[in-house]
Amino acid sequence: MRVSSSIKADPSKGDKLVRRKGRLYVINKKDPNRKQRQAGPARKK
């Protein structure tokens, strides 16, 4: 899964933007290698 500060989804390639637990994810059932997550604030210890 790619993690970057700014993610873009391409619906023509099967990408879907999903918000889970306050983070943005790109999921793709056709091509699972296109998974992405938007980097948020660092985790609290």
From Swiss-Prot:
Q: Which GO terms describe its cellular component?
A: ribonucleoprotein complex; ribosome
**Superkingdom of this entry's organism?**
Bacteria
Give start-end of the signal peptide: none
Q: Which GO terms describe its molecular function?
A: structural constituent of ribosome
Q: Does the keyword Ribonucleoprotein apply?
A: yes
GO-annotated biological processes: translation
Q: Name one Pfam family in it.
A: Ribosomal_L36
Q: Where is this region: Disordered?
A: 1-45
Which UniProt keywords are listed? Ribonucleoprotein, Ribosomal protein
Q: Which SUPFAM superfamilies does this UniProt record tie to the protein?
A: Ribosomal protein L36
Q: Which family does it belong to?
A: Belongs to the bacterial ribosomal protein bL36 family.
Instruction: From the Swiss-Prot or TrEMBL record, give the protein name.
Output: Large ribosomal subunit protein bL36
User: What is the scientific name of the source organism?
Assistant: Chlamydia trachomatis serovar D (strain ATCC VR-885 / DSM 19411 / UW-3/Cx)
Its taxonomic path starts at: Bacteria, Pseudomonadati, Chlamydiota, Chlamydiia, Chlamydiales
